[in-house]
Structure formats: C-alpha cells, structure tokens
Regions:
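Conserved beta-strand positions in the central sheet of alpha/beta enzyme cores
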Residues: 36, 63-65, 104, 146, ...
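Catalytic-core regions built around general acid/base machinery
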Residues: 47-58, 130-138, 195-198, 225-230
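Acidic-residue sensor for enzyme active/binding pockets
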Residues: 36, 148, 154, 189, ...
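Active-site acidic/histidine proton-transfer and metal-coordination neighborhood
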Residues: 18, 56, 79-177, 259-262
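A short acidic, helix-capping loop that chelates divalent metal ions and anchors anionic groups
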Residues: 70-75, 111-117, 153-154, 187, ...
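N-terminal pre-domain/capping segments
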Residues: 1-100, 173, 201, 255-278
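Histidine-acidic metal/acid-base catalytic patches
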Residues: 1-13, 17-28, 158-180, 185-278
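Active-site-proximal loop/turn and secondary-structure-junction residues that shape catalytic pockets
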Residues: 11-13, 39-41, 67-70, 107-111, ...
Length: 278
C-alpha cells in the first residue's frame, strides 16, 4: 500500500517563526506530501504566513501540541484543568484554520509531571472529562484529536498502547483516536508490531521516530517489525517523521545526533521508501 508521508517541523526548532517557513519548500522537494506543525501560539494571525506558504506549495498539514503543569488536564485544581481545555480548544481552532484535520499529542495529561504513583481512577476520569470537552469542540471544527502515549520517563498516566487504548475506549467519542509514536513504543512495548495490530481499530495517525530522535533507520528501532505491523493493521492514514533538534529542551536532546537537518529530512524519507518497498 502507498502511504502519504509528512515531516514534523520540530526538526528545525521549537519556535514556529517565519525563519522555519522557508524550509517547507525543501520538505516538498524531497517528496513529502505534508507537514506536521507544533501549535504553541494560539493567535490565529500568527499562523497566516504559514497558511499562505502551505497553500502555495500544496502541502497537507497536521498539528501537534502538549501541555505543561499549568494546564494539566488531570490536575486536582479545576481551574488548571479548564486552562488546559481552553488552550486545546484554541489549538483546535488553529488546526482548522490551517486546513488540518488532526491535532495530536499527549494532552490527555501534562508532559513530565509525575505524582510518584500510578494514575488513580480519579485522574483517569478527569482526563476523560477534559478530552470530551475538547472533543465536542473539535467535532464542530471537523478536527480529530489523536491522543499519544509517552514512555514512562515522560508520563505516568498512559505509557503503553494498551493503557491508551483503554482510555480512548472509555472516552468513546468519534473525534478521539490514537496517535501511535514508534519512539515511545520502542521503549515500552514487548513487540511494537503486535501492539500496533492490537490497537489498530483506534489508530488514526502514526509518527515514525527513531530511538535517537534523529534520522530514521540509523538507530535501534526495529523498523522491519514496525512495517510488518503496519502491513497487518489495515491502516490507511499518514506516516509522519518526527525528529528533534537540541533546540527543543522538552525533548531532552542534549547533543546533535545528525549532520544537518536537510540530510536528516532527506535520508528519513528515502529510508521509509525502502521499508515500504517503493
């Protein structure tokens, strides 16, 4: 099966300013069909230059975001939860404005906030309630929320495929699906391909990310296993390359694991084509 492939622009840095827009043409030139853009700014006017260039190039677009402690959607403080909900609704609005249909990320709870214990049922209930509030708004904008699990060093609420699958089933909303990221699966799953097949009916979006967070095919992720799982899950969505620069503190990338961003973008695309047998 032929898949459409997108590149996440975080490879160029965390601030989606106009200096990063210039790289969109190269992403298109390499062969990518779309881009995935992080939403940290919720002023629609900020995104006008992005929309203009995306439309000019004919790229399709997806968005991602995450929450900090001050917007934790499972906080015991209702005001904090509401702040997270309000931010996500604005991110949905930006997503729709850009012409995107998917907003993904680990926003079922906050990034890198820990209680020192496993999640309580109350925390899971708060997550469900928060996601339902955002999902209703997303539905009105024709946007799907793709929830992502993170590895246990970045999140304690959902840190494996089965936990996220259970949460999405509990939320039970047509605009809430799973976004599967191979980086976290490489750490947490016994068999990534089998995990993909097991949760296939709820997977709507897939990120391909190497163990080094750099060039696909140059780390320890078992890509043969990943693409075997992909071939068995009847997935018809997109494949998105996610790689990070040391400029993104939240990713804890303290050294550069690639030569240049341009080479990373190109080699990752070429390696995906090899794995797909294209």
């Amino acid at each position: 099966m032929k898949y459409k492939i997108a590149m996440n622009t975080l490879v160029y840095g965390p601030d989606m300013n106009e200096s990063i827009i210039q790289h969109l043409a190269y992403i298109k030139e390499v062969g990518y069909d779309g881009v995935e853009i992080p939403i940290f700014v919720t002023d629609i006017d900020y995104w006008t230059p992005w929309k203009k260039e995306i439309d000019r190039l004919g790229l399709e677009v997806f968005t991602v975001t995450f929450l900090g402690a001050d917007m934790n959607t499972i906080s015991a403080d209702a005001n904090v939860r509401q702040k997270g909900i309000d931010f996500l609704k604005k991110a949905v609005d930006i997503t729709a404005y850009l012409g995107a249909s998917y907003l993904s990320g680990p926003f079922h709870s906050a990034l890198a906030v820990f209680s020192g214990a496993a999640p309580t049922q109350q925390e899971l209930d708060w997550s469900k309630e928060s996601m339902l509030a955002v999902a209703d708004h997303a539905q009105s904008k024709n946007v799907i929320l793709g929830l992502e699990y993170l590895n246990r060093f970045e999140n304690y609420v959902v840190s494996c495929a089965d936990q996220l699958y259970a949460l999405v089933k509990a939320i039970n909303h047509p605009n809430v699906k799973i976004m599967f990221d191979t980086f976290h699966a490489h750490i947490e799953e016994f068999n990534t391909g089998e995990a993909m097949v097991r949760i296939a009916d709820e997977v709507g979006h897939i990120q391909l990310s190497e163990s080094t967070r750099a060039t696909l095919g140059e780390g320890q992720v078992r890509w043969d296993n990943v693409f075997d799982g992909l071939s068995r899950m009847n997935y018809t969505g997109w494949l998105v390359v996610e790689a990070f620069t040391p400029l993104l503190p939240a990713a804890c990338i303290w050294r550069k694991n690639y030569t240049t961003e341009a080479e990373l973008v190109k080699k990752s695309y070429e390696n995906i084509q090899k794995y797909l047998g294209a």
